């Protein structure tokens, strides 16, 4: 049975996109190469051999069978939802709205009426910073912390001992309903945290995403899909036969091993620690360590591939930890294909929908959106 595996290394951009300045990226982001430089280099022989590092501008020669290059996102966004959607053939032509000055008061008031309590925050902020600023007030009052970022997100942070997880998720479902037209906010995110005023507050791994419903895409055509990590949530679960909602790279590793034992034709996984723990927190050394750890995971995955498998490694956007910003960056993304018949430097390809086109071609599915990288 032919099988396709796509692993997204979240935030591992491969160099400044031509339209980066239109997305407020003026400091020439280049996530992978800047992580390499800032960390003094790192050992990742499997990522080097397949061409993933070379695609990211790192001076490591691929082996002769490597088929690799870069993809240029054409959708109007630089976030995980837009990136994953584009991989599966969705071209987001109009950007989702952002709220740098906070959400409209009518939206906040409607949300407060529905959940039966006031909220605090309503501003653009770093998620780790705002819980330090408002965590004590939240604990004292029980009022949820509502905030946004540079992305189109409505985030709700609550202490796990004050607002139980399921209640927080219910808040998010209410917000998801309210955040459709005319607001059309792309994603509602539950941000549970723990801690106290004395020791500080820390986000937990029980985050949950509630995205805007995905337009029709390749997953609807395949349907026999095993999703690992945040991926199923980005598509509102539609088309996934099996899912494993893991929360960290070590958990994703275990889930991916389980997925490879299944009979799913398409395995779609996201490893988010690069972005979540190191990109947003401007930690290039931690980013490098995570790449070294993932390289070991890649070695295991390669050893379990069959002759009928292809494995595609890519990213959904950039998140350069060496920049002053703590937000995503508009970059090319690397792509490396393992299991293809021949090696080649593919250069730059327009459209991340090339991922879906390649998966569809390998699985024998009639799909006309994107460039098949097996034939490029």
Question: Where are the regions a protein language model picked out?
Answer:
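Feature captures the catalytic ectodomains and active-site-proximal regions of enzymes
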Residues: 1-376
């Amino acid at each position: 049975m032919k099988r396709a595996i796509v692993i997204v290394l979240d935030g591992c951009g491969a160099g400044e996109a031509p339209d980066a300045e239109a997305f407020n990226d003026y400091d020439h982001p280049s996530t992978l190469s800047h992580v390499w430089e800032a960390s003094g280099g790192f050992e990742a022989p499997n990522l080097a051999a397949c061409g993933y590092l070379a695609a990211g501008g790192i001076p490591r020669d691929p082996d002769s069978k490597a088929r690799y290059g870069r993809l240029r996102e054409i959708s109007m966004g630089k976030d995980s939802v837009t990136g994953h959607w584009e991989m599966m053939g969705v071209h987001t032509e109009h950007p989702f709205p952002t709220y740098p000055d906070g959400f409209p008061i009518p939206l906040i008031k409607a949300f407060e009426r529905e959940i039966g309590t006031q909220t605090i925050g309503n501003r653009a902020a770093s998620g780790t910073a705002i819980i330090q600023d408002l965590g004590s007030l939240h604990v004292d009052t029980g009022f949820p912390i509502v905030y946004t970022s540079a992305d189109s997100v409505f985030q709700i942070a609550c202490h796990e001992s004050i607002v139980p997880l399921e209640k927080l998720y219910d808040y998010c479902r209410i917000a998801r309903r309210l955040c459709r037209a005319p607001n059309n906010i792309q994603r509602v995110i539950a941000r549970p945290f723990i801690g106290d005023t004395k020791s500080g507050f820390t986000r937990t791994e029980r985050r949950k995403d509630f995205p805007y419903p995905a337009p029709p895409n390749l997953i609807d055509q395949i349907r026999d899909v095993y999703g690992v990590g945040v991926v199923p949530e980005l598509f509102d679960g539609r088309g996934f036969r099996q899912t494993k909602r893991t929360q960290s790279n070590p958990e994703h590793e275990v889930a991916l091993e389980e997925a490879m034992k299944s009979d799913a034709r398409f395995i779609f996984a996201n490893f988010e620690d690069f972005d979540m723990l190191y990109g947003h927190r401007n930690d290039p050394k931690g980013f490098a360590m995570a790449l070294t750890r993932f390289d070991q995971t890649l070695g295991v995955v390669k050893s379990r591939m069959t002759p009928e498998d292809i494995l595609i490694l890519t990213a959904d956007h950039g998140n350069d930890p060496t920049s002053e910003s703590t937000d995503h960056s508009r970059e090319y993304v690397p792509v490396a294909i393992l299991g293809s018949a021949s090696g080649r430097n593919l250069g730059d390809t327009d459209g991340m929908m090339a991922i879906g086109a390649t998966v569809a071609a390998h699985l024998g599915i009639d799909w006309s959106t994107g460039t098949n990288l097996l034939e490029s």
